[in-house]
Amino acid sequence: MAAPVRGMAVSSSIGNTTSFQKKTRSKLVFIPGTRPSVQNGQLLVSSGVSSLDYVIGGGLAVGTLLLVEEDRYDSYSRMLLKYFLAEGIVCGHELFLASARDHPDQIMQELPSPILDDVASMKMSEGQSQPNDPDNPDTMKIAWRYQNQPRVQTALASSSRFGHYYDASKTMDPELLQAAKYHSFYQLQETPVTTGLSSLPSPYLALLKSIQTLIQKEGFDGSTPQLRGRNVLRVGLHSLGSVLWGDDVCCKDNSAHCHALSTFLYALRGLLRTSLSVAMMTVPSHLIQSRAVMGRIIRLSDTAIALESFRGSEKETNPLYKDYHGLLYVRQIPRLNCLTSEVPDTKDLAFKLKRKQFTIERLHLPPDLSETVSRVSKADLAAGCASTATGNKHLHF
């Protein structure tokens, strides 16, 4: 009876050794200036504007393209591009800046100065509602039933801080600029590239090859093993689609290169998807004649926003918009590793440039508390109801 017991012990010990291994959480790549998304686990970087990060779902996903439709004078879209580049310098990311109008070195000299002290933490509390003070004589200016209602939160801010804050009234320290690893592409100084059978104009083809060479040479290609610490490449493309890039979509409706920018975006997104890089591109949409071309450009971008400046328009003198400098429209939100995207809680957005900071807020119009509202006075009613009403006074019912 002893032998079977030993055999059973041996067989039971063999049966206990299985190939089962406990599944552990995969290790995420840690890169300074990045964090994983809580929605889809995608690696995110900050755009340099915390309120813009909140609008587009927490930040820019690595491997994606952000399209910014320029305002009429390219003032605020250029500022967003500078915030995007400045955030890369503070986080230690590598930069690639391409331009055809202004030299990239000139744009780099205009980057805003970062705020690295404790004052930046106070920016998160701006725009928060304050409790109503019963002793304040201004608390009963509107109906009493609305007095205890919570005020509209105009400021857009996340519960956790991501990114840095910048002082728009100062430029970045030259020592920070010199320490940054920066690559430039100035179209007017580049040697023309033979297109051959390619449908791309020479400037677009040269720009695409320059980005591809940089990604492969500096080790940002995700398909190749990294020989050193991983980093993110930030690509800034200024005013693509303009005439200076050899494109004619801004000149006529039926342009000869109507598919040039679309083809360029196809190839660019292919490079971004397989590399640790993120791009921001500005396009003068108000100059592009064909709406179909602009629609293709938006659909070929992962994230798309548009800026409408009040400068030179009737809205600049409209008292309803006196606290803002323009409107922001969300054209497209990325859908990455999921079926649906995070929809913003509001589509009525406006931006303003304070003395030191560019912010995006909910467009909220407070109640009209002025005493000179457009209502008919009692004197007008009395005169209008009289049988001998004269002048511009009409009978009101």
Curated annotation (Swiss-Prot):
Q: Is Nucleus among the key words of this record? A: yes
Sorted alphabetically, the Gene Ontology BP terms of this entry are: regulation of transcription by RNA polymerase II; tRNA wobble uridine modification
Q: Which UniProt keywords apply?
A: Cytoplasm, Nucleus, tRNA processing
Q: Which InterPro entries match?
A: Elongator_complex_protein_4, P-loop_NTPase
GO molecular function terms attached to this record: phosphorylase kinase regulator activity
Q: What is its main location?
A: cytoplasm
UniProt xrefs under Gene3D superfamilies: P-loop containing nucleotide triphosphate hydrolases
Its subcellular locations are: Cytoplasm; Nucleus
What Pfam families does the annotation carry? Answer: PAXNEB (PF05625)
Q: In which pathway does it act?
A: tRNA modification; 5-methoxycarbonylmethyl-2-thiouridine-tRNA biosynthesis
Q: Origin, by domain of life? A: Eukaryota
* Gene Ontology cellular component list: cytoplasm; elongator holoenzyme complex; transcription elongation factor complex
Could you say which protein family the record assigns here? Belongs to the ELP4 family.
- Please describe what this protein does: Component of the elongator complex which is required for multiple tRNA modifications, including mcm5U (5-methoxycarbonylmethyl uridine), mcm5s2U (5-methoxycarbonylmethyl-2-thiouridine), and ncm5U (5-carbamoylmethyl uridine). The elongator complex catalyzes the formation of carboxymethyluridine in the wobble base at position 34 in tRNAs.
Could you give the subunit structure recorded for this chain?
A: Component of the elongator complex.
Q: What name appears for this protein in its UniProt entry?
A: Elongator complex protein 4
